[in-house]
Amino acid sequence: MKPRPPGPSVNGVVCVDLGGTRLRVAVFRPDGTILQSNVIDTPRDEPAALVEAMRKALAQTAVRATAAVVGVPGPISYRDGTPLRLPNLPGWEDHVSAHRLSAELSLQVRIANDADLAALGEHRFGAGRGCSDMVYVTSSTGVGAGVIINGRLLHGRWSLAEAGHMIIDWRAGRTVEDLGSGTALERLTGEDGATAAAKARAGDATAIEAFREVAQAFATGVHNLVHCFMPERVVIGGGVSQAGDLLVEPIRRQLDQCNMGCPTAGKDVVLASGGDDVGLLGAYALWRDAIQASPSVRNPDAPRDAQNPHGLNA
């Protein structure tokens, strides 16, 4: 008699980072082990591809997933898991609601803002570890932010800190995202943010000049957030952050020029260290926190003190 392949023995979670450029899907065990991870270009005209990508990831593992956490690039209603608007993915709003995804996948689904999840991921596993109050700001296709206060993710009914939509040029009504994002950089250089960053680091004069313009706009947005929340640390992420000091130094200079009498607020400005999977790790952390807070949904097969290789409980 042939041995039967092992069936699903533990509950897991499907974590999704839906970006304007990339769609990342991973399946986690309760202990934080990533069993399967897939990355594809976001098919902007095919919102149904999200469900197919999640099903594919599940089919490639032996985990019995019971839940999913999906990070989306825009403000959401945290009460019912409905995206309010996805500026970089117009038309996707109805396809990524918690109610619709739950019905299509037969999973408990939670929707969160992607920058909120990245902030949580950096706070638990990356450059924000060890600090109580932190602002995470990312510049990629768009600009987003997440805020950690007293060690907890901060949001209101309709998300929080939609930094990309702060107006910094009031005469023309232009926002931080209009002027300080990877899209703005691409408009100036003809290259995506990561490529332009590499060229700037290599000394390309056109890329350096474009970065100066974009970095100044981005720094203004970070400056405004720092004076709203007075964090002890600012973590900078996203594709544009690959430029390193070309992006970070303008932020530090602007904060040095105006600190509102608080000499330490926002002075600890660092680059994100969680890598490309930080949004997925934040989604896992959100799910893990939920099952720890609700024993009724805890996986009975996983011990309460299961060690997390990413240091969740550290």
PLM regions and their residue ranges:
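Short hydrophobic alpha-helix segments
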Residues: 38-40, 87, 157
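ATP-binding/phosphotransfer module of carbohydrate and carboxylate kinases, centering on a glycine-rich
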Residues: 1-69, 78-82, 101-107, 121-135, ...
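Active-site glycine-centered loops adjacent to acidic/histidine catalytic or metal-binding residues
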Residues: 114, 140, 283
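General beta-strand structural signal in soluble alpha/beta enzymes
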Residues: 109-113
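A charged helix-plus-loop insertion that forms the helical arch/lid used to bind
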Residues: 82-93
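A short acidic Gly-Thr/Ser loop motif
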Residues: 17-21, 138-142, 159
